[in-house]
């Protein structure tokens, strides 16, 4: 027997297998120990975090998930009815049916904003409208339409609106709102005081000053025209009362006669200088008319 076979041991392979098993067990033990240490360290880090930071992290994650998932908008399927005609068959069972029938089909071109567009059977047929459609609050009532030239005026005086009934007499309206003259006079006085105040004028620019002066002028002219109309109304009322004292039937003046009565009253109550100015103006007006009637003006 050789030396090689003498030195062989019967349990050599079993010892190698035992060494490999021990090495594997030690590796697995170290790995499990490392995982336990990492888990404990992560738990310690989470314990140190506040609830606010955890809430913020949760919201950020939710927002990212919401952005990733895009909403899917389903297109509404609407059905319209189309009228089709077909020929009758002699051998068909339904000979009593009409030549036209309604078939249901899906169409996207004939719909308008997801609503059904009713089709007329003929061009002379009336337009069909759903009874579920709400009636608009603002409707065009015949007789109450606003003219085109007055549509730009957004705010209208309801006293002269047709929808409130018949138009009242201007004299009645003036009597009802005559108390507003006091407020108008106060406003004019305040505006005049502001325009006379030097401190106030130094604070505003030239454009604002001109605008205030123009507004003052228009307010004065409006108030004066109202007072003139009131005066003319009183003059005509007194004249008609004197004229109809002994008359059983009341007599009313024409517009031309009213104008003459008012002019006569104003001329009688004028001062001498005012009368002279009026007479001079009338004389120039008469001379101008006579000058236009000369022969050399008629030449071509």
From Swiss-Prot:
Subcellular location: Nucleus, Nucleolus
Main localisation: nucleus
Biased composition regions of type Acidic residues, renumbered to the chain: 85-109
GO terms, biological process: maturation of SSU-rRNA from tricistronic rRNA transcript (SSU-rRNA, 5.8S rRNA, LSU-rRNA)
Tree of life domain: Eukaryota
Biased composition, class Basic residues, residue ranges: 114-124
Residue span of region Disordered: 33-146
InterPro entries for the chain: RRP36
Coiled coil: 203-248
Keywords, alphabetical: Coiled coil, Nucleus, Phosphoprotein, Ribonucleoprotein, Ribosome biogenesis, rRNA processing
Modified residues (Phosphoserine): 14, 41-42
One Gene Ontology term, aspect cellular component: nucleolus
Quaternary organization: Associates with 90S and pre-40S pre-ribosomal particles. Interacts with CKA1, CKA2, CKB1, CKB2, PWP2, UTP15, UTP17 and UTP22.
Its biological purpose: Component of the 90S pre-ribosome involved in the maturation of rRNAs. Required for early cleavages of the pre-RNAs in the 40S ribosomal subunit maturation pathway.
Record-linked PANTHER family: RIBOSOMAL RNA PROCESSING PROTEIN 36 HOMOLOG
Similarity comment: family membership: Belongs to the RRP36 family.
Annotated protein name in UniProt: rRNA biogenesis protein RRP36
Species whose genome carries this gene: Saccharomyces cerevisiae (strain YJM789) (Baker's yeast)
Gene symbol of the encoding locus: RRP36
